[in-house]
Amino acid sequence: MQQNILKHQLKELGQKLLAKLKYKKYFRKTSLKQKDVGEKFLNEIASKNPKNFLEIGVFHGVTARNVCELLYSMHKNDFKYVGLDLFGINDETSNEIIPNTKFNNPLKQIYFQYILNQDPYSLEAVTHLLKKFKNNVHLIKGNSNNLLKKMDMSKIDYVFLDGGHAYETVKNDLENSLPVLDNNGTILCDDYNLSYAPGVKKAIDEFVLVNDFKIEILFDYRFAKIEKK
């Protein structure tokens, strides 16, 4: 009983702290740039009060930084963030839909290329962005098709899935994340309604149907939240 009360109090505290948090872009590219989407995303995460967070598809690390700020506001240093990404374009991305890594703003291009001398999509650049939380963050470079099989997913209580958009990749990522759901965790999938990547929706719908999970479509059909019934 006391444990449930404590969880409720922590959840309320996290949501109060969230009111002071805004989804910041940190002078980088992010897919959550549309009005209020970032704040809604953070609010959704806060409602679950996770401590062990996995992001599949880190890109420039903007969402990672926002998530770490949120988790710190709720748990101080008692949280863990794990991020998987290829951190670059190579042969493994040839069949994938990769976000445009070039800036529309020439000032940002100059800043990264000539001042920081960094590729913002590199492991080095993302590590630099997250250095404030270096003791809480574990970034892993590689293909999720291979990496997830080697991870102890039972320790993760929240997955944000925004990696490869090919049907087989999404299917694989979801299947390897099953232990998270078995432990009453949450998987939040981005780009559920992405018209030029129909494999995302197909893989999610099949996964939910086969396993008889609960699915909730959020924010104008953009996100699919999967949990046990």
Regions picked out by a protein language model, each given a short descriptive name:
Residues 2-49:
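Class I SAM-dependent methyltransferase Rossmann-like catalytic core
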